[in-house]
């Protein structure tokens, strides 16, 4: 297996200046070996997240560091963030749950161990779980997430366990900044604090990343954007991890509310705005691609990104299930998914051919309501998030997410809720939906956002490019004037998602 940095797919394109590896890379952008490893991984491939599911098993409760943005909870069903689970599992319970989920959700292709503590602070449970899953379900990709403190000690064990993807959370490479994020670490049977703790942590993280890259393990770097603490500094983090062979960089917004009980939440540290996050992601994109579709999942998440079906697979429910692992059924289902993906790409490319050469300076941002499968298949009133696409003569580029409060509640909508949604997508020219009622449609039009429902249940890329083609045509004919919709200064209470 080659080291990651030897693959030409992880270098910047001479034509575009953008990296051709990472979450937005397609079949033609990557070496065949790398493509086969990421094509059905919903975190490492942006397109795959429309079609494939993942699951996390909560077998790693202990942690060896304290983060000011984290508060682990082991019996919590109503918070959607990392470090939270409804129940802890033994390795034996975990593998039974994996089989149950894989049987029920044949597009589930990835198992991750992401807490609620740190996977490598619980090595016996973590690697026993991975071994049991490899034996019972050999087609499932294995992942783990770690803060990196113990990583150098377990790199060879990770390779032997056939873990192909590792996520490392790296929030700084400057110990003075790190001291503001981490109160303490526990290393070599001793607790360290302050700058000394942060120095040990960053050295271990970067050492572990280099070791994994040399062994061909695909590494995703998670970084939490904390305004006025590490926001400007994350550009340096990006350079450091890129030079050490990281495959993908995921800059996530700080989740900071008092009810979560984190240090940052309790002291009023704000999270970034949507525009602040996108500006930073754009600044870092180039030699490495940025992951923009992260949902900051719970440590027991199950299903497609953006949905959580973990309540269907509690330990009590799984124990009652009569499960049989049908590998051939899973292969057949996933083959149908791949055929669908090929059709989707072909449809988008055909539509894009009609836009070539048309007013290349125009770019517009649109919001899409989708439940997955790469389709415009969600009702405006039921949408809990909108996916954002930047449209240009180069195509439809996924650039982020906006989480919203559902407009429809118990069969009715409220005007104040609509105003909040419109505020959250105020920089978009249009919103694509499967269906929309008269009241929200009228409100959106008044706000200058075009509601588009004529492409219901059609492919996102094909439909948005078709709309863009018509939009550019109207501009050329003088029927409308193109105006870039800007984002006003930060509004109190702005909410964003990690993409």
Curated annotation (Swiss-Prot):
[4Fe-4S] cluster 2 binds at residues 294, 297. Binds 3 [4Fe-4S] clusters per monomer. One cluster is coordinated with 3 cysteines and an exchangeable S-adenosyl-L-methionine. The two others probably act as substrate. GO terms for biological process: nitrogen fixation. Residues 49-298 form the Radical SAM core domain. S-adenosyl-L-methionine binds at residues 69, 117, 169, 221. The keyword Lipid biosynthesis does not apply. Its EC number is 4.-.-.-. PROSITE patterns: MOAA_NIFB_PQQE (PS01305), RADICAL_SAM (PS51918). The keyword Oxidoreductase does not apply. GO terms for molecular function: 4 iron, 4 sulfur cluster binding; lyase activity; metal ion binding. Keywords: 4Fe-4S, Iron, Iron-sulfur, Lyase, Metal-binding, Nitrogen fixation, S-adenosyl-L-methionine. [4Fe-4S] cluster 1 binds at residues 63, 67, 70. Its cofactor is [4Fe-4S] cluster. SUPFAM superfamilies: Nitrogenase accessory factor-like, Radical SAM enzymes. Pfam families: Nitro_FeMo-Co (PF02579), Radical_SAM (PF04055). CDD domains: NifB (cd00852), Radical_SAM (cd01335). Pathway: Cofactor biosynthesis; Fe-Mo cofactor biosynthesis. Belongs to the radical SAM superfamily. NifB family. Involved in the biosynthesis of the iron-molybdenum cofactor (FeMo-co or M-cluster) found in the dinitrogenase enzyme of the nitrogenase complex in nitrogen-fixing microorganisms. NifB catalyzes the crucial step of radical SAM-dependent carbide insertion that occurs concomitant with the insertion of a 9th sulfur and the rearrangement/coupling of two [4Fe-4S] clusters into a [8Fe-9S-C] cluster, the precursor to the M-cluster. This is FeMo cofactor biosynthesis protein NifB. It comes from Bradyrhizobium diazoefficiens (strain JCM 10833 / BCRC 13528 / IAM 13628 / NBRC 14792 / USDA 110). The lineage of its organism: Bacteria, Pseudomonadati, Pseudomonadota, Alphaproteobacteria, Hyphomicrobiales. The gene is nifB.
């Amino acid at each position: 297996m080659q080291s990651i940095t030897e693959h030409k797919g992880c270098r910047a394109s001479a034509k575009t200046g953008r990296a051709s590896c990472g979450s937005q890379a397609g079949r033609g952008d990557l070496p065949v070996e790398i493509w086969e490893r990421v094509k059905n991984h919903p975190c490492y491939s942006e397109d795959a997240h429309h079609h494939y599911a993942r699951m996390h098993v909560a077998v790693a409760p202990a942690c060896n560091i304290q983060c000011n943005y984290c508060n682990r909870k082991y019996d919590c069903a109503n918070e959607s963030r990392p470090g939270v689970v409804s129940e802890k599992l033994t390795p034996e319970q975990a593998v039974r749950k994996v089989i149950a989920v894989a049987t029920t959700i044949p597009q589930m292709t990835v198992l991750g161990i992401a807490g609620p503590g740190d996977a490598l602070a619980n090595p016996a449970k973590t690697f026993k779980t991975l071994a049991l899953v490899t034996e019972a379900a050999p087609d499932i990709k294995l992942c783990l997430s770690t803060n990196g403190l113990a990583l150098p000690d377990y790199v060879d064990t990770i390779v032997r366990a056939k873990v192909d993807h590792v996520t490392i959370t790296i929030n700084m490479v400057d110990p003075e900044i790190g001291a503001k994020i981490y109160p303490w670490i526990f290393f070599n049977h001793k607790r360290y604090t302050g700058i000394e703790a942060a120095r040990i942590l960053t050295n271990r993280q970067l050492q572990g990343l280099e070791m994994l890259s040399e062994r061909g393990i695909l590494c995703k770097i998670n970084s939490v954007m904390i305004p006025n603490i590490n926001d400007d500094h994350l550009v340096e983090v990006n350079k450091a991890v890129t030079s050490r062979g990281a495959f993908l960089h995921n800059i996530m917004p700080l989740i900071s509310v008092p009810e979560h009980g984190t240090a940052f939440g309790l002291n009023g540290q704000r999270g970034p705005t949507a525009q602040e996050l996108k500006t930073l992601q754009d600044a870092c994109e180039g030699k490495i691609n940025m992951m923009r579709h992260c949902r900051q999942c719970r440590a027991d998440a199950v299903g497609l990104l953006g949905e959580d079906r973990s309540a269907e697979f509690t330990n009590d429910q799984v124990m009652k299930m009569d499960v049989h692992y049908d590998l051939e059924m899973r292969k057949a289902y996933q083959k149908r998914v791949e055929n669908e993906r090929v059709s989707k790409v072909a449809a988008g490319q055909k539509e894009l051919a009609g836009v070539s050469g048309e007013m290349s300076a125009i770019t517009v941002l649109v919001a899409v309501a989708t439940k997955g499968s790469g389709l415009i298949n969600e009702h405006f009133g039921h949408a809990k998030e909108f996916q954002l696409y930047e449209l240009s003569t180069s195509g439809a580029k996924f650039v982020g997410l906006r989480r919203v409060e559902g407009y429809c509640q118990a069969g009715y909508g409220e005007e104040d809720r609509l105003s909040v949604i419109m505020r959250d997508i105020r920089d978009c020219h249009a919103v694509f939906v499967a269906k929309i009622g008269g009241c929200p449609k009228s409100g959106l039009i008044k706000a200058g956002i075009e509601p588009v429902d004529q492409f219901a249940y059609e492919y996102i890329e094909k439909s948005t490019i078709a709309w863009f083609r018509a939009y550019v045509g109207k501009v050329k004919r003088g029927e409308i004037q193109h105006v870039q919709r800007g984002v006003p200064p930060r509004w109190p209470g702005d909410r964003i998602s990690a993409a």
